[in-house]
Regions:
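Divalent metal-coordination and catalytic microenvironments
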Residues: 27, 54, 93, 148, ...
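Alpha-helical scaffold segments that form or flank carboxylate-/histidine-based iron centers
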Residues: 39-55, 74-95, 162-165, 169-177
């Protein structure tokens, strides 16, 4: 089993870069119970989102990288250097692992330490950051991601369409919000703004 690390925020990329004996990326088990995000995200949504969508992105990445210069590259290198379908699928693999890992570490606690200081310095307060982050997700036209990225001591909210990923632009991701429809469409009573807050 081949694993590599890129150390991006909460995610070490070990999960992203785990491969089988044929050098194919593999879907790793979700690091928590599928129902543990309820009532915010339903078990059905987690099963479909993680088990179907993420699995499809992994499968597509494996097919598209086979026999190319990217075949033995870690996911973060594919994201930085590839384009088209390979970039889109590899970025979605990273984006989804990062998203689900962040949900695993999330909770009712406000950030502490250096992150808390940086949020205050860049946004005024944690509450101000949450409001701006949520607004960025609501304002994003179509599907995509909203990222909290860091460059030195500067934090930035970076709305990104489609599969865009901050690694491609040399940014360090700290947090993401998935605003693709598959993140919430299975429960009609869920509305995007409820999930973003």
């Amino acid at each position: 089993m081949n694993t590599e690390s890129c150390h991006c925020g909460l995610l070490s990329c070990k999960e992203v870069n785990t491969r089988d004996k044929d050098n194919k990326f593999t879907l790793q088990p979700l690091p928590y119970a599928e129902n543990s995000l309820e009532p915010y995200i339903s078990e059905k949504t987690v099963k479909f989102h993680y088990g179907k969508h993420l699995a499809a992105y992994i499968d597509n990445t494996n097919k598209l990288k086979a026999g190319t210069q990217f075949d033995d590259q870690p996911i973060h290198e594919i994201i930085k250097k590839a384009s088209g379908g390979l970039f889109n699928n590899a970025a979605q693999v990273f984006n989804h692992y990062f998203y689900f890992e962040a949900l695993h570490h999330s909770g009712a606690q406000a950030p502490r330490g250096k992150l808390s200081n940086l949020l205050e310095k860049n946004f005024g307060s944690f509450e101000d950051f949450k409001e701006k982050f949520t607004q960025a997700g609501t304002a994003l036209f179509g599907s995509g991601w909203v990222w909290l990225v860091q460059e030195d001591d500067k934090l930035e909210i970076w709305p990104a369409p489609n599969a865009e990923n901050p690694l491609k632009n040399g940014r360090y991701p700290l947090l993401t919000m998935d605003v693709w429809e598959h993140a919430y469409y299975l429960r009609s009573e869920e509305h995007t703004s409820e999930l973003q807050s």
